[in-house]
């Protein structure tokens, strides 16, 4: 309790935390809680199970409580907000529209960023929507930079999306992440001219007066948008000239200085340093905190944590609500009408309630995006930007909206791009760093080679039901086509799963399948083995977890697995994202994930709390044809087995290539075992019991100590002798001095 109290956590929350046996904060909690309590935006990355949910839930609960308490007692903060209206009255770079490490001089024209690892950008205070315009940029050093034009919808990282057009010092033009050769390189003492002809949809550049020719043709759908001066720097310094001073290389052909643009063609930036202030009157359906999760299970897990942390928070009590799809909305609407302070939910249902006016964002103080990389990969970028735009940036008591983003990795381009748009000078708390495999996890690869292991030819119809990709192909034994080997791989993988379970006498494991259909087929195969959902305690008892299962069934299945009522949880990556299941000794990858980061996420399910874990990956030696639905139904009722490039919904999946990418990512070679799946003893750990704590000393370590023991004893004797000699020498010196 004292450890959390020292970080400023209120006693009521600290008491609840203590009852959860959290004696000390985890690393992510120790770093993030003070930052959030201090009012800052925070980007945090840590492994699942590291206490990440507590890192944002605890401060959110406390600040929401303090806000409600102040309202209850009639206290009001200062709602005055500094505006940038005076800044917008002249052409200069905008201090309210820049990266966190981007500095602007007092004149508004000299710009600098000394960040050497990341790009930081900025836009001007004003833009233009009609006419032909020109400005100059002088390079003051040899750093990297891109200059050009962009709309307010663009990322500050100029040229990495479809709303910006840039020209870089390496002699590349950039638009929508496409970097092409253009003009020539430029560096210190060079002057770059930036031309914009909106009427003819042209962007071009010059170097020291030399016209470099057409760079971009502006798409027709952008013709009526306002374009702003833009740049992005990496350890560089530039100075802009919008025409208030004489140009070094005056433009020709009717181009005029931006500062001379007619008022009717000038558009002021919306990024003014001020913001919409939330209304003072409280609404029952207007929560103070909105926490968005990528899945129902993760939303339920987070809500349970919130309930635990707020257990002793009273006067006023906090009211929380879970908003997820797949369940009746009537009860959720009733709770909303009665009043709610913290909302936890998934994007679909939250979006529905916002669009119908049932959920108000007018008083949101906290916006939390948990597993942000998962939200973005599921296509919720527009949803996030849309709701962010509806939330007042300043609360009625004068506090700024706080945005907290949690992600498996902060090195994702999309996460960085999102943070630039919706966060205010965020602090990065990255305790995950580069992906690595914990010492408590043994991970091995089992090659699945149908050309060597002919077992599949003898199984007749007793094998696992396959996904139907080859139902129209001739895959009978004796053939030598890619389709034959692909179908054989699917059959062998089912047999290898059963073999692995029996070989290691697995009592609990998570089995990752690539698709929902694969999960269903694996569950059915376990039923064939005598197991399944209804066979509690059976060697092949199992439950399924994926988005096609109804929410009550998913919740029930997850609880049964956590309580060890069944041995195996068969699931997809999306369904299992972020769910914290402790003490699982085994993970089996039926198919390698197509994103290398997901491999680390999967095998990270084992080896937690210092318990040993084994991750087994089945890797096909040949390419496997698999479903890859691009149809509108997303696979429901789809039997189009043609390849994607031929208008179908299948691809050839190359697991050997994926394995090499994973090994390169982890900078290690993953051990391979034979198809009998016997894992040899580890040289250091010796015999390991997976699911148990790692032995403090094991394997060869004890013998190593015995070998070193005589040497250590000799060193101790020498140390004693040296110290005795030193003391004796000091005594003799004193006696000698006295004799004189």
Swiss-Prot record:
The helicase domain is involved in the stimulation of RELA transcriptional activity. InterPro entries: B30.2/SPRY (IPR001870), B30.2/SPRY_sf (IPR043136), ConA-like_dom_sf (IPR013320), DEAD/DEAH_box_helicase_dom (IPR011545), Helicase_ATP-bd (IPR014001), Helicase_C-like (IPR001650), P-loop_NTPase (IPR027417), RNA_helicase_DEAD_Q_motif (IPR014014). It is found in: Nucleus; Cytoplasm; Cytoplasmic granule; Cytoplasm, Cytosol. Belongs to the DEAD box helicase family. DDX1 subfamily. Residues 1-448 are annotated as: Interaction with dsRNA. The gene is ddx1. GO terms for biological process: double-strand break repair; mRNA processing; rRNA processing; tRNA splicing, via endonucleolytic cleavage and ligation. GO terms for molecular function: ATP binding; ATP hydrolysis activity; chromatin binding; DNA binding; DNA/RNA helicase activity; exonuclease activity; mRNA binding; nuclease activity. PROSITE patterns: B302_SPRY, HELICASE_ATP_BIND_1, HELICASE_CTER, Q_MOTIF. It catalyses: ATP + H2O = ADP + phosphate + H(+). A motif (DEAD box) lies at residues 370-373. Its EC number is 3.6.4.13. Gene3D superfamilies: 2.60.120.920, P-loop containing nucleotide triphosphate hydrolases (3.40.50.300). One of its GO terms (cellular component) is mitochondrion. Acts as an ATP-dependent RNA helicase, able to unwind both RNA-RNA and RNA-DNA duplexes. Possesses 5' single-stranded RNA overhang nuclease activity. Acts as a positive regulator of transcription. May be involved in 3'-end cleavage and polyadenylation of pre-mRNAs. Binds DNA and RNA. Component of the tRNA-splicing ligase complex required to facilitate the enzymatic turnover of catalytic subunit rtcb. Binds (via helicase ATP-binding domain) on both short and long poly(I:C) dsRNA. Residues 70-247 form the B30.2/SPRY domain. It comes from the Eukaryota. It is an enzyme of class 3 (hydrolase). Keywords: Activator, ATP-binding, Cytoplasm, DNA-binding, Exonuclease, Helicase, Hydrolase, Mitochondrion, mRNA processing, Nuclease, Nucleotide-binding, Nucleus, RNA-binding, Transcription, Transcription regulation, tRNA processing. Residues 2-428 form the Helicase ATP-binding domain. Residues 493-681 form the Helicase C-terminal domain. CDD domains: DEADc_DDX1, SF2_C_DEAD, SPRY_DDX1. This is ATP-dependent RNA helicase DDX1. ATP binds at residues 46-53. The keyword Cytoplasm applies.
């Amino acid at each position: 309790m004292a450890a959390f109290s020292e970080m400023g956590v209120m006693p009521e929350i600290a008491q609840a935390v203590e009852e959860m046996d959290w004696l000390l904060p985890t690393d992510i909690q120790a770093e993030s809680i003070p930052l959030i309590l201090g009012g800052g935006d925070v980007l945090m990355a840590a492994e699942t199970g590291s206490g990440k949910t507590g890192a944002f839930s605890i401060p959110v609960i406390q600040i929401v409580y303090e806000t409600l308490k102040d309202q209850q007692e009639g206290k009001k903060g200062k709602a005055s907000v500094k505006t940038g209206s005076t800044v917008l009255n002249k052409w200069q770079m905008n201090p309210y529209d820049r990266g966190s490490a981007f500095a602007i001089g007092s004149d508004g024209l000299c710009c600098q960023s000394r960040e050497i690892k990341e790009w930081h950008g900025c836009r001007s205070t004003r833009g233009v929507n009609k006419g032909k315009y020109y400005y100059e940029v002088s390079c003051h050093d040899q750093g990297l930079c891109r200059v050009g034009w962009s709309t307010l919808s663009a990322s500050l990282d100029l040229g990495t999306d479809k709303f910006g057009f840039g020209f870089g010092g390496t002699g590349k033009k950039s638009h929508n992440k496409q970097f092409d050769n253009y003009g020539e390189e430029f560096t210190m003492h060079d002057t770059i001219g930036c031309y914009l002809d909106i009427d003819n949809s042209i962007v071009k550049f010059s170097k020291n007066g030399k016209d470099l020719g057409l760079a971009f043709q502006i798409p027709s759908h952008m013709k009526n948008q306002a374009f702003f001066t833009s740049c992005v720097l990496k350890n560089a310094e530039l100075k802009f000239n919008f025409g208030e001073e004489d140009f070094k290389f005056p433009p020709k052909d009717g181009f005029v200085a931006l500062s001379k643009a007619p008022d009717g063609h000038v558009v002021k930036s919306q990024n003014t340093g001020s913001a919409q202030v939330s209304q003072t009157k409280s609404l029952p359906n207007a929560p103070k905190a909105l926490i968005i999760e990528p899945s129902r299970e993760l939303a339920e897990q987070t809500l349970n944590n919130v309930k635990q942390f707020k257990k002793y928070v009273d006067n006023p009590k906090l009211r929380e609500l879970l908003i997820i799809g797949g369940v009746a909305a009537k009860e959720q609407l009733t709770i909303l009408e009665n009043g709610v302070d913290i909302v936890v939910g998934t994007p679909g249902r939250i979006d529905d309630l916002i669009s119908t006016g049932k959920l108000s964002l007018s008083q949101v103080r906290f916006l939390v995006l948990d597993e942000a990389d998962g939200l973005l990969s599921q296509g919720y970028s527009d949803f996030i930007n849309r709701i962010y735009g509806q939330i007042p940036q300043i609360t009625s008591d004068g506090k700024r909206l706080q945005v907290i983003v949690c992600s498996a990795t902060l090195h994702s381009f999309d996460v960085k791009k999102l943070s630039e748009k919706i966060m205010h000078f965020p602090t990065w708390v990255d305790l995950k760093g580069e992906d690595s495999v914990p010492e408590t996890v043994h991970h091995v690869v089992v090659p699945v080679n149908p050309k060597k292991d002919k077992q599949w030819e003898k199984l007749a119809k007793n094998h696992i039901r396959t996904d139907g990709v080859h139902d129209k192909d001739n895959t009978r034994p004796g053939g030598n086509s890619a389709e034959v080997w692909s179908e054989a791989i699917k059959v062998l993988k089912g047999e290898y799963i059963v073999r692995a379970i029996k070989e290691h006498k697995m009592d609990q494991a998570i089995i990752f399948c690539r698709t929902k259909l694969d999960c269903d087929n694996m569950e059915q195969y376990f039923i064939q083995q005598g197991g399944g959902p209804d066979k509690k305690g059976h060697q092949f008892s199992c439950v399924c977890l994926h988005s096609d299962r109804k929410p009550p069934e998913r919740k029930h299945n997850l609880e049964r697995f956590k309580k060890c009522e069944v041995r195996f949880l068969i699931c997809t990556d999306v369904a299992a994202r972020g769910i914290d299941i402790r003490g699982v000794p085994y993970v089996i990858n039926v198919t390698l994930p197509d994103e290398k980061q997901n491999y680390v996420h999967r095998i990270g399910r084992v080896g937690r709390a210092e318990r040993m874990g084994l991750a087994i990956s089945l890797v096909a030696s040949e390419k496997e044809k698999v479903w890859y639905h691009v149809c509108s139904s997303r696979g429901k009722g789809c039997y189009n087995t043609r390849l994607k490039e031929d208008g179908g919904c299948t691809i050839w999946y190359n697991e050997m290539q994926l394995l090499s990418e994973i090994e390169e990512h982890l900078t290690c070679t993953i051990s391979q075992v034979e198809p009998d799946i016997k894992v040899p003893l580890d040289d250091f750990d010796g015999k390991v019991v997976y699911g148990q704590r790692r032995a403090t000393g094991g394997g060869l370590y004890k013998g190593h100590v015995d070998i070193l023991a005589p040497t250590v004893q000799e060193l101790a004797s020498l140390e004693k002798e040296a110290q005795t000699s030193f003391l004796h020498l000091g005594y003799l010196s004193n006696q000698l001095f006295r004799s004189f």
